[in-house]
Amino acid sequence: VRIGNGRIGAMVFGGIEEETIALNESSMWSGQYDENQEIPFGKERMNELRKFFFEGKIQEGNQIAGEFLHGNGHSFGTHLPIGDLKLTFSYPENTVSNYRRSLDLGTAISTTNYTIGDVNYVRECFATNPDDVLVLRMSASKKKAINAKLSLSMLRESEISTDGNQLIFEGTVNFPKQGPGGVSFQ
């Protein structure tokens, strides 16, 4: 299930023993500015092109368009995902039942529900626009029933550290196939 607020996005896979949340953020771009991409076409050329097409001179119009309406072969980069947040859960040996995933279109909350033995588990994930954060809320019908290990698998060159209760990752969005460069992030 995909969720997001226009800047932060995630794909919630909804597993029971392992939950994967693929993370995304709008500024994660590889590449760099390339002034050679800006080939001026000009108002005169556009008028000439329109004239050819309106007169039915398609071949001549295509010649002008093919010659002037494209960038050069340099790549300016691409948008790339951040990485995967993984939660690995430990449960007492028992039967899983009542598994259900949903996305409430009114609240934009992705929910995963299931029961193991006599314990009901609920995971809710959403991205708020006013607070500009991604939230994962986990609950269980019995106290101390949630036992999970957290890991972050970064798809970019990065370092991960902690500061109090914050997980910090910083690095560079580099994708050699798309050329040099990329934004730095924290």
Please give the residue ranges for each predicted region.
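Aromatic-residue-lined binding/catalytic grooves and analogous aromatic/hydrophobic interfacial grooves
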Residues: 1-186
